[in-house]
Amino acid sequence: MSNGHFIAIVQATLIVLCTIGVWHYSTSNDESQHSGNLVVVDSNDIEHRFEESPSRVVITNTYAGTVMRMLDIDLDVIVGASGDFQDETIWPEFTEIPLVQLSAHSEIDFEALLDCYPDVYIVFASNGMVDTGAIRDKLEPVGIKVLALDFYKYDTLEQEIAVLAKLFGKEQEAKEIFEEFEEIENMVEERISGIDDSLKPNVVMEHHASLTRDPVVLTGTSQWTDIIERAGGINVFADLPGHTTHVDMEAIIDANPDVLMFDGI
């Protein structure tokens, strides 16, 4: 047999073996994505199955980090995070955690992310600046579950906390948090229930983008309107379209709000 024929046979064999390897990985990965008795459903209505609580997690926003703290989840499971956690005063646990993206809204450094070998990537579910579907399409085929949870919308906050609580075996901690929520809500409701609408304070909630450009306000579809109304206030710009919208400074002055607030970054 000539050297040329031998080399051709070796090359063909390697191609076949690589093809079989890729097929086996793809098949086993698909099976692992759909197996396990620990089942949670995220805020995109995607079901995720786990054999056990994940031990390698990447988180992108401080909302998720705060909820993990509230539930007393061991933060040693965090193997990667965004630049939103780089304030050592607030997040000292994250000083040595690898950076996988500059912020919760920025592009992912996929090489850095894959180097973390995460089981789960926790991301916003419905934030307009994050394409959660595209992220899922890229990460889940390589075995990384994309868990979509917002943690900043009050009407879904308890359900989302419950998802993490179930995933990490912190149901009792969640129960205590929910009881405290209910106690505070009842106290506020009792205090404001007798207040006439004409006496409720008018509130303008500005988006933090207003700090660097023309005013941007939160409207009726934003998470803030629900909180403002629960607290006994009235969002002056609730009827404007969109989640956020630009307004003139004159519009804010003309509204003559009793309270002017900025949302956090």
Please give the residue ranges for each predicted region:
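Secretory targeting signatures
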Residues: 1-31
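Extracytoplasmic substrate-binding proteins
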Residues: 26-29, 36-37, 47, 131-213, ...
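Short helix-initiation/N-cap motifs at beta->coil->alpha
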Residues: 43-45, 99-111, 130, 152, ...
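A local structural motif
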Residues: 47-54, 92-101, 230-241
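A short, structured surface patch at a secondary-structure boundary
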Residues: 59-116, 120-129, 233
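Solvent-exposed loop/turn segments at secondary-structure junctions
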Residues: 63-66, 84-87, 120-121, 126-130, ...
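Alpha-helical, coiled-coil/dimerization segments enriched in small aliphatic residues
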Residues: 215-243
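Ligand-binding pocket segment of bilobal, Venus flytrap-like solute-binding proteins
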Residues: 225-227, 244-265
